[in-house]
């Protein structure tokens, strides 16, 4: 068991009491063993060495009292493992040591000698006849908890993992003690017990009003103020009057310096609140203000070590208490919570919600019947007075019932409402009936009927509240509500609601309003019998108290209109000075009270400026006014919390009287129901069996190895606390208001990952990869590092020899010689493939220059031919034959002889180039032909296309149409036969001379061009190749684009040529200006001639154009020559 747990459970039990509790279970066994014990062996007196004591089952946990001197020890036979308090008579026998046996001083391990209890223990045994009772006065059952057993509920679990140490900075010098102030007099046991548990657990304290909940909170706040260095302590209360009231009490009891405390509300500017959070440690504020400061970043949730929640029964639903605790727990788990209330809740579920929302692990609850607080509770005389309605009320009820009868009959006609008396209508009953009707027959009713019923429900619900005011509060509040209802309808433009106008025009309604207006003109008119009895009760109370007495009285009313009517009547009575105490909200007929006005009203009431305070629900909680001797509840509430809060305003320092004014019937039943509900809930909470406490949220702040001891002493109050009695609010100075509010601070929990998170990692629960930390530049220094000497930097002679031996020599060759390698012999290009890849490293990563070099080597390697990539030389010599292209010779000026041809020009090379080009073109044509034929099933159409080609060939040889651009259009027009024409037909793109293979066997295979004599035609002869290309649906621009695209892909795949001819613009790039294969063949037989106008042959197929070598620009020739069209099929060799 942990030491702190042991101390928390049994810290107030003396050691002797603990020994007694542990030995109770073995008393009976010890008594029976004494009767059956053997006679002890006698021995002589004298100093002897101490006998060894065998260990027992209690030796590890209980410290035995000191044993008697050795001369008085008398061994007694015992039962194994038993203890005895008195030795058996006749056990001592005097004799000499010589007569004693050898084993006289031996003791059996099975029969140990237990220690003899002290005289104090024996005196406590006689006090076992006391009876222990519960808080309700009943005797505890003996079989419920044995004397040597520990309670079942443990604050700490040994099987749970160790708690995380607190992040708060602690004052280790102060952790050894916790202070209990004695400034208020004698110590109350229940307060001491609650403070001790509240320091180490999240505690819910439920005490009746006036029993010192503020003292408990101030004591715990004082100790956490001592234990921590910079942590914040926050006291939250629902309203500013309650918070300001706790300021004076805590500063006057705990002795915390006033300079470290502040009061913050919504009226304090954010700039000043931010400054207070930076400089103060103790805060009194409302929960709404605390939530705003936490959300905007003014307050750090991790810095709050203690949160005191006043009126904790509000911590349900979506109230600000719940939001504050939830927000703080998102960032910090090391926080202590102390919840104070007089009424925890009216239901078991409500109390469990408070436990869950605040993280309560321990409950301290007392009732007025508890034994330990009975002596501190002053008597309260409760006087319940019931009333019957007055004659005026009966008359008004009758007239109003007649006016509402038509509307109620409409509901009865639809089987919605079965009541006969309209004065029994309630807002909740009408709302319930409306929901049930819409869920049943109303959902299928006609739209006109449905709209009419909704209008009736709306009118009756607004009037049901006025019926309640008439029954429980009087005629005047009832009349004010009806006057407002009438003015709202009459002020509307147009006709308004038909049903409302029907009600206002009813004769009974008009008669009732006129009657009430006549009564209200009378000054002595009281609209309710409660008002008459209230005035008499208050006047009698002040008369009995005397003229100079400081007695006070508080009247509670549920509605503001009733409170104002009560104040008007009481101020007309003698000895009464009444004032109203309401909330901040403005109503339709009156303004609310600001927090400053509320505080001033309470101070005047305490000082005697007013002796009667008429308050609404805002005065039910927390008001600590000791001189209140009379409480009058003008109306009863069904909530036991509100009822007990009202009663708790009296009897705090002396006996008080409570007067309940109830109407017979419903109001009286509500009071009895609330009273029974309160007693039942108190018993359930005291039992604690039906609640689940949150031990997991109540972490320990003080380290487990530290056990603070109580220090009961008088606490010195600083002088500054007594000199300045004003509230410690921040002052609104011009300098403070000129400061700008800091930007919103987003508090983050510990070990949270900020920034962008990988979506894939978030789905699979993997941590997101963090970006590499950018190294920071070295900091600049004012001093320079000393330059080391050259001898320390360079290699020494021995190091140089070792370096040359290891890195510059190879093993001996077969000729017994050592081969030396110099740095000049290193071949940096020996392993080109390895230089283009980053190799794997272990500890040292590749540098920036290494990555750049590898990238450069990789780029250079990819630019080479894959087949010749690793063949030396690597592209240093141009292997292209662009110089062997046939170029016309340059004629010398002034001479008729042709110029000398260049060294790269020869007929053999020219013929080889032409043959290779024709072979590549023929292979492409054959592959395309086979592909097109295999894909198409239109054999007949292919035959027609061949016939068209034959006709085109005959036309080309016999026709006399001139060659030119316009011929293409005419050729296309002549082609208008019924033959099938396929788009992008590559066979038709080529001319007749490229596809004919009938004369291949008659040729000798030479490149002289003799077999082409029959095909030589003039320049003015029209060829089929001129107009067949125009039938291709592809436009010339698209042909050129596709040609350039294919040419670009081929250049990137192969190695780049050494020489790249210039590219012409769009105006010069034309298919008509590109040389044809026939033109290249004709140039071999040409002779240099004078300048003439250039003539371009018909365009050839675009697919074969990629395989032709690049040509240099032609020079103008002197004479036009005939062109020879060559057939590439003749050069095809199998």
Curated annotation (Swiss-Prot):
Bias (Basic and acidic residues) ranges: 985-999
Domain Helicase C-terminal positions: 538-699
Keyword Oxidoreductase appears in the UniProt entry: no
Compositional bias annotation for Acidic residues: 1-18, 941-956, 1000-1017
Main location: nucleus
Domain Helicase ATP-binding stretches: 194-362
Function per UniProt: ATP-dependent DNA helicase involved in DNA damage repair by homologous recombination and in genome maintenance. Capable of unwinding D-loops. Plays a role in limiting crossover recombinants during mitotic DNA double-strand break (DSB) repair. Component of a FANCM-MHF complex which promotes gene conversion at blocked replication forks, probably by reversal of the stalled fork.
Family affiliation: Belongs to the DEAD box helicase family. DEAH subfamily. FANCM sub-subfamily.
Assembly and interaction partners: Interacts with the MHF histone-fold complex to form the FANCM-MHF complex.
Identification of the protein by name: ATP-dependent DNA helicase MPH1
Provenance organism: Chaetomium globosum (strain ATCC 6205 / CBS 148.51 / DSM 1962 / NBRC 6347 / NRRL 1970) (Soil fungus)
């Amino acid at each position: 068991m942990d030491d702190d747990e042991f101390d928390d459970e049994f810290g107030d039990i003396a050691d002797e009491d603990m020994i007694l509790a542990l030995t109770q279970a073995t008393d009976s066994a010890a008594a029976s063993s004494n009767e059956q014990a053997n006679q002890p062996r006698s021995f002589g007196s004298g100093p002897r060495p101490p006998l060894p004591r065998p260990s027992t089952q209690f030796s590890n946990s209980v410290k035995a009292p000191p044993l008697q001197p050795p001369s008085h020890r008398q061994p007694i036979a015992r039962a194994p493992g038993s203890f005895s308090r008195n030795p058996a008579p006749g056990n001592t026998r005097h004799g000499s040591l010589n007569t004693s046996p050898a084993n006289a001083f031996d003791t059996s391990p099975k029969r140990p000698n237990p220690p003899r209890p002290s005289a104090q223990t024996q005196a406590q045994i006689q006090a076992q006849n006391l009876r222990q009772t519960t808080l309700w006065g009943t005797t505890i059952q003996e079989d419920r908890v044995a004397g040597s057993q520990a309670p079942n509920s443990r604050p700490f679990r040994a099987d749970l993992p160790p708690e995380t140490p607190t992040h708060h900075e602690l004052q280790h010098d102060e952790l050894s003690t916790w202070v209990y102030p004695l400034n208020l007099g004698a110590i109350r046991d229940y307060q001491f017990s609650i403070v001790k548990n509240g320091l180490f657990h999240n505690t819910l304290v439920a005490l009746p009003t006036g029993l010192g909940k503020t003292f408990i909170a101030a004591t715990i706040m004082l100790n956490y103020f001592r234990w921590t260095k910079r942590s914040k302590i926050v006291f939250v209360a629902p309203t500013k009057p309650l918070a300001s009231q706790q300021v004076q009490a805590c500063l006057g009891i705990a002795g915390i310096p006033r300079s470290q405390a502040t009061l913050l509300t919504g009226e304090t500017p954010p700039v000043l609140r931010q400054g207070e959070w930076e400089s103060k440690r103790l805060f009194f504020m409302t929960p709404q203000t605390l939530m705003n400061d936490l959300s905007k970043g003014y307050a750090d949730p991790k810095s709050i070590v203690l949160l005191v929640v006043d009126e904790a029964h509000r911590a349900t639903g979506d109230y600000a208490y719940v939001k504050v605790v939830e927000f703080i727990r998102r960032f910090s788990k090391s926080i202590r919570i102390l919840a104070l209330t007089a009424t925890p809740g009216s239901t078991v579920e409500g109390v469990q919600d408070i436990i869950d929302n605040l993280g309560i692990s321990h409950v301290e609850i007392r009732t007025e019947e508890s034994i330990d607080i009975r002596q501190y509770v002053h008597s309260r005389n409760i006087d319940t007075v019931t009333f019957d309605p007055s004659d005026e009320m009966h008359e008004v009820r009758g007239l109003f019932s007649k006016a509402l009868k038509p509307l109620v009959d409409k509901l009865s006609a639809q089987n919605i409402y079965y009541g006969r008396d309209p004065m029994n209508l309630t807002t909740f009953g009408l709302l319930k009936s409306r929901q049930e009707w819409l869920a049943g027959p109303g959902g299928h009713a006609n739209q006109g009927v449905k709209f009419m019923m909704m209008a009736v429900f709306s009118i009756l619900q607004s009037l049901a509240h006025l019926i309640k005011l008439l029954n429980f509060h009087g005629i005047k509040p009832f009349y004010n509500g009806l006057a407002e209802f009438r003015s709202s309808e009459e002020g509307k433009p147009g006709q308004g609601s038909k049903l409302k106008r029907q009600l206002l025009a009813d004769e009974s309604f008009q008669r009732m309003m006129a009657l009430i207006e006549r009564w209200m003109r009378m000054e002595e008119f009281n609209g309710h019998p409660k008002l008459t009895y209230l005035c008499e009760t208050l006047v009698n109370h002040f008369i009995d108290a005397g003229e100079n007495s400081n007695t006070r009285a508080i009247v509670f009313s549920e509605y503001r209109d009733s409170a104002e009517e009560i104040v008007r009547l009481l101020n007309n009575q003698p000895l009464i000075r009444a004032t109203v105490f309401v909330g901040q909200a403005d109503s339709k007929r009156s303004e609310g009270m600001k927090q400053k006005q509320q505080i001033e009203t309470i101070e005047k009431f305490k000082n005697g400026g007013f002796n009667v305070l008429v308050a609404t629900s805002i005065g039910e909680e927390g008001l600590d006014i000791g001189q209140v001797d009379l409480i009058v509840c003008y109306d009863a509430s069904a909530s036991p919390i509100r009822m007990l809060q009202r009663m708790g305003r009296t009897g705090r320092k002396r006996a008080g009287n409570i007067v309940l004014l109830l109407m017979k019937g419903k109001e009286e039943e509500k009071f009895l129901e609330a009273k029974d509900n309160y007693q039942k809930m108190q018993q359930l909470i005291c039992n604690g069996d039906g609640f689940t406490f949150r031990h997991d949220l109540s972490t320990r702040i003080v380290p487990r190895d530290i056990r603070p001891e109580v220090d009961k002493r008088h606490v010195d109050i600083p002088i500054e606390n007594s000199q300045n009695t004003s509230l410690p609010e921040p002052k609104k100075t011009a300098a403070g208001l000129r400061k700008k509010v800091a930007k919103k601070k987003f508090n983050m929990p510990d070990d949270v990952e900020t920034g962008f998170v990988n979506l894939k990692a978030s789905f699979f629960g993997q941590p997101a990869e963090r970006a590499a930390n950018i190294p920071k530049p070295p900091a600049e220094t004012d001093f320079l590092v000393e330059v080391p000497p050259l001898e320390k930097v360079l290699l020494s002679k021995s190091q140089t020899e070792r370096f040359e031996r290891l890195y510059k020599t190879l093993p001996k060759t077969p000729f017994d010689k050592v081969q030396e390698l110099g740095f000049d012999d290193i071949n940096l290009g020996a392993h080109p493939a390895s230089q283009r890849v980053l190799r794997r490293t272990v500890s040292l990563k590749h540098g920036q220059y290494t990555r750049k070099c590898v990238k450069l080597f990789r780029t250079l390697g990819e630019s080479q031919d894959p087949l010749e990539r690793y063949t030396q030389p690597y592209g240093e010599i141009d292997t292209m034959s662009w110089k062997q292209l046939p170029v016309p010779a340059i004629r010398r000026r002034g001479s008729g002889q042709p110029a000398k041809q260049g060294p790269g020009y020869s007929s053999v090379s020219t013929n080889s180039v032409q043959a290779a080009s024709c072979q590549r073109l023929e292979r492409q044509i054959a592959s395309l032909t086979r592909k097109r034929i295999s894909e198409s099933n239109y054999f007949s159409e292919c035959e027609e296309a061949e016939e068209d080609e034959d006709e085109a060939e005959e036309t080309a040889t016999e026709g006399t149409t001139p060659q030119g651009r316009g011929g293409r259009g005419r050729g296309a027009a002549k082609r208008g036969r019924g033959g099938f024409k396929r788009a992008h037909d590559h066979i038709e793109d080529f001319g007749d001379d490229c596809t004919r293979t009938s004369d291949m066997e008659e040729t000798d295979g030479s490149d002289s061009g003799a077999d082409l004599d029959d095909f030589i035609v003039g320049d003015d002869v029209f060829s089929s190749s001129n107009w067949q290309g125009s039938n291709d649906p592809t436009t010339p621009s698209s042909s050129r684009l596709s040609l350039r695209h294919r040419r670009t892909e081929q250049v990137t795949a192969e190695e780049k040529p050494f020489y790249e001819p210039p590219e012409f613009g769009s105006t010069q790039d034309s298919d008509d200006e590109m040389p044809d294969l026939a033109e290249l063949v004709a140039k071999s037989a040409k002779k240099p001639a004078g300048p003439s106008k250039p003539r371009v042959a018909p365009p050839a197929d675009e697919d074969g154009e990629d395989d032709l070598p690049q040509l240099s620009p032609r020079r103008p020739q002197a004479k036009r020559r005939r062109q020879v069209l060559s057939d590439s099929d003749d050069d095809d060799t199998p």
